[in-house]
């Protein structure tokens, strides 16, 4: 069983821009990437995050006859940024896996497929177009392009980090790209608008944090990738790590961390970036806790954190929570 697991790479494609460096720079400047705008005809402007245009061909030499969907392109670009940041070469990629997490999946591709099937083609359509509607098509595109041969799978609204942590801990992989991706659709915005959950003024962004009972939210598309790696692989490759992932849990429960977030690290540090990004992107204080050198509890259990460790706890829909402890020395 592997003893130590490290975070060695970050990849980001968000409304703040493409690339880890550009994104974190804007985060430190206090930007969120959210704007009051309408992305679809007939839908009123609301607070939303729009991805900046990035030339897929500029970064990716795609040789297959069928071009990836915009959903897959977003995923490929996010993983590319993480792979470059972790300095993973072609030889190491052969034993690297990828765990993809999504909530909405390729909803836009499904909508386009059904419109063409029902209204344009009248029931006659190429089976190749159906493959673009399957969630794990994006995972296949990434695996083929980067020639990944390690364990890979797709998760729906679960933690890719938790699964990757277990795979490395059990010795089933040395490097795993953990990723989360979603592309917001007009159907989601229409539904949330009908339920009164959207915001229509940029100055109301604080309501996302303050009024957690009402459930105000701002939606955006994006992809985030984190590279987890065993200590043996890290030493063999001679690369540096951001931090050590000490512990990782996921569970169904209803309790939240008892104390509000306290952060003492500079924002240039990994834990500071995580906290700053999470609050800007709309995670409420009750949903996230990052703590240094203090006790915390979940349910009936109490734990003591070492002075150099950071606890990250996030709670998502359905009372599914994730707990990560990061050594930030």
Predicted regions and their residues:
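Active-site-proximal alpha-helical scaffold in enzymes
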Residues: 75-85, 141-180, 221-237, 274-299
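Short, well-ordered secondary-structure micro-motifs
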Residues: 109-111, 188-190, 323-324
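Acyl-CoA/ACP chain-elongation machinery
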Residues: 174-196, 201-210, 214-215, 248-255, ...
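Fold-independent oxyanion-binding glycine-rich loops
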Residues: 10, 101-103, 133, 146, ...
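Condensing-enzyme catalytic core mediating Claisen C-C bond formation in acyl metabolism
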Residues: 2-13, 18-47, 192-263, 299, ...
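Active-site pocket-shaping loop/turn-to-helix segments
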Residues: 59-80, 130-131, 151-162, 208-225, ...
């Amino acid at each position: 069983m592997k003893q130590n697991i490290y975070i060695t790479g970050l990849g980001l494609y968000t409304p703040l821009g493409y690339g880890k460096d550009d994104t974190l720079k804007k985060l430190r400047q206090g930007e969120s990437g959210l704007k009051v705008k309408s992305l679809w005809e007939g839908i009123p402007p609301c607070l939303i995050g729009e991805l900046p245009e990035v030339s897929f061909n500029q970064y990716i030499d795609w040789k297959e006859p069928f071009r990836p969907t915009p959903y897959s392109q977003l995923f490929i670009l996010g993983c590319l940024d993480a792979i470059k940041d972790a300095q993973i070469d072609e030889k190491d990629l052969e034993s690297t896996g990828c765990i993809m997490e999504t909530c909405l999946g390729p909803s836009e591709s499904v909508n386009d497929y059904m419109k063409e099937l029902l209204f344009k083609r009248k029931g006659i359509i190429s089976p190749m177009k159906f493959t673009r509607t399957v969630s794990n098509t994006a995972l296949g595109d990434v695996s083929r392009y980067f020639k990944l041969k390690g364990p890979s799978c797709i998760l729906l609204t679960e933690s890719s980090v938790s699964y990757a942590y277990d795979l490395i801990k059990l010795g089933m992989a040395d490097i795993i790209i953990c990723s989360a991706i979603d592309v917001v659709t007009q159907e989601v915005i229409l539904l949330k608008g009908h339920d009164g959950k959207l915001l229509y003024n940029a100055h109301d962004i604080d309501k996302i944090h303050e009024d957690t009972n009402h459930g105000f939210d701002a939606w955006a598309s994006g992809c985030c990738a984190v590279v987890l790696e065993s200590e043996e692989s890290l030493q063999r490759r001679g690369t540096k790590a951001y931090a050590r992932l000490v512990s990782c849990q996921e569970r169904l429960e209803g309790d939240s961390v008892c104390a509000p977030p306290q952060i003492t690290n500079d924002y240039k540090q990994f834990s500071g970036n995580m906290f700053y990004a999470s609050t800007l992107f709309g995670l409420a204080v009750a949903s996230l806790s990052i703590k240094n050198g203090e006790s915390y509890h979940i349910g009936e259990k109490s734990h003591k954190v070492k002075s150099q460790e950071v606890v990250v706890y996030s709670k998502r829909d359905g009372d599914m929570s994730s707990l990560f402890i990061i050594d930030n020395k």
